[in-house]
Amino acid sequence: MGLSMDRSPYSRTGDRDRGCWYYLRYFFLFVSLIQFLIILGLVLFMIYGNVHATTESSLRATEIRADNLYSQVVGLSAAQANLSKQLNISTLVKDTVMQQLLTTRREVERINASFRQCQGDLITYINYNRFIAAIILSEKQCQEQLKEGNKTCEALLFKLGEKVKTLEMEVVKEKAVCSKDKDSLLAGKRQAEMQQEACGKAREQQKQDQQVTEEQLRKVQSLCLPLDQEKFQADVLNVWRDSLVYRSLDNIGYHYSLMPEFSSLRRTCESLPGIMTTKVEELARGLRAGIERVTRENGELRRQKLELERAIQGEREARTRAGTEAQARETQLRTECARQTQLALEEKAALRTQRDDLERQLEARKRELEQLRTEVDVRISALDTCVKAKSLPAIQPRLPGPPPNPPPIDPASLEEFKKRILESQRPPLVNPAVPPSG
């Protein structure tokens, strides 16, 4: 029983903690040794002693020793009874202590597991601190970018306002120029209409003059074309011969044949048809020259008329083209002004949207940061509580020291961390209560 108790795990808990059975073992060992020595002495006495001489004394001594031994046995019996009671009590205490030991070991294991979990949470929160630091830096960068974006937005709005004012001034100037061009074109149109009307009247007058001239030309041609010089000369000669002057010259020749001037007079009278023919021919040539001159003038007038018509047509085309160009330029300016205004409004709206998005992102980052700070504070306080609650010695895992140069933040891990935090902050979906059946 002593050996089985020696092999119990309670005897091995420590060198300093001594149980009841440890002392009882030495007690029984000393008792057994004393009994062995007594028996050995008796045997030696019986073998080597004088039995007959010392029987009475030995008997008395034996009685005395027996009485002593009886008293010792009685005392040892009482001590054994007491020790049995104490042993029973110690067994109960041992069972209680063993139960407490098992409970303590379970508690130690639980505390170790909690401590390991706290160490893992500590490592996790150290990593979370890196993410939080990255989020804080990102928040600062977002704030700086928001400030820069606000400055850029204000500068762009100012530039767009100046550009809109410049465009409005240019539109006003272009409208004034278009109005001046329109007025000049209207004046040119009225002048061209007046010139066209005058040209129409001149053309009608020229047509009438041309008709009259053509009629006169036809008459003159009808009169001049049949004129034959030889026939005209023969007719004039016949008329001359049939005239009274010719006959009178013939009769005078008989009476005044001795006069010296008569022959010259006769030659003059005879050459009179030729002179008349020459004069008529000169008149015909002059008439032909006049007809040719009138024809040339008519051709020149026709050419001027065609040039004037072409000039009028060109003026009309130029006026139409100028009006079309002015209208197209005005339409283009209006379209460009509307487009620039629309672009300015779109850029302004885009900048406002971007600024609102940056503000929303900044607010979300602030909320995430506050939530993370709160969660980290809670976890750190829980970790401190776990560390303080660990009272028994245990092999504590060595905390890894912070690396001198932390690795860079992975954007994917950072986004996953943000998503996990946002999902943890979502309100749980509450299922509607199902009414009990029956």
Curated annotation (Swiss-Prot):
- Composition bias type Pro residues, residue spans: 399-410, 429-438
Q: Which residues form a coiled coil?
A: 289-383
Q: Which residues are glycosylated?
A: N82, N88, N112, N150
Q: Which UniProt keywords apply?
A: Cell membrane, Coiled coil, Cytoplasm, Glycoprotein, Membrane, Signal-anchor, Transmembrane, Transmembrane helix
Q: In which tissues is it expressed?
A: Expressed in lung (alveolar endothelial and bronchial epithelial cells), kidney (endothelium of peritubular capillaries), spleen, liver, adrenal (endothelial cells of the zona reticularis of the cortex and chromaffin cells in the medulla), pancreas (islets of Langerhans), testis (germ cells, interstitial cells in neonatal testis and spermatids), ovary (stromal endothelial, thecal layer of developing follicles, luteal cells within the corpus luteum), intestine (endothelium of capillaries of the intestinal villi) and pituitary (pituicyte cells in the neural lobe) (at protein level).
Q: Does the keyword Cell membrane apply?
A: yes
Quick one: where's region Disordered?
393-438
The record's annotation in InterPro entries points to:
PV-1 (IPR009538)
Could you list the residue ranges that cross the membrane? 27-47
Q: Name one GO molecular function term.
A: identical protein binding
Q: Which domain of life is it from?
A: Eukaryota
Q: Per the annotation, which location comes first and is thus the protein's main one?
A: membrane
Q: Which Pfam families match?
A: PV-1 (PF06637)
Segments in the Extracellular topological domain: 48-438
Q: Which GO terms describe its biological process?
A: developmental process; MAPK cascade; positive regulation of cellular extravasation; regulation of vascular permeability; tumor necrosis factor-mediated signaling pathway
Subcellular location field: Cell membrane; Membrane, Caveola; Cytoplasm, Perinuclear region
Instruction: Please indicate the ranges of residues that lie on the Cytoplasmic side.
Output: 1-26
- Membrane topology annotation: Single-pass type II membrane protein
One Gene Ontology cellular component term attached to this UniProt record is: caveola
Assembly, in brief, is:
Homodimer.
Q: Which PANTHER family match?
A: PLASMALEMMA VESICLE-ASSOCIATED PROTEIN
Q: What does the record give as the function of this protein?
A: Endothelial cell-specific membrane protein involved in the formation of the diaphragms that bridge endothelial fenestrae. It is also required for the formation of stomata of caveolae and transendothelial channels. Functions in microvascular permeability, endothelial fenestrae contributing to the passage of water and solutes and regulating transcellular versus paracellular flow in different organs. Plays a specific role in embryonic development.
Q: What is this protein called?
A: Plasmalemma vesicle-associated protein
What organism does the UniProt record list as the source?
Rattus norvegicus (Rat)
Recite the lineage of the species.
Eukaryota, Metazoa, Chordata, Craniata, Vertebrata
Q: Which gene encodes it?
A: Plvap
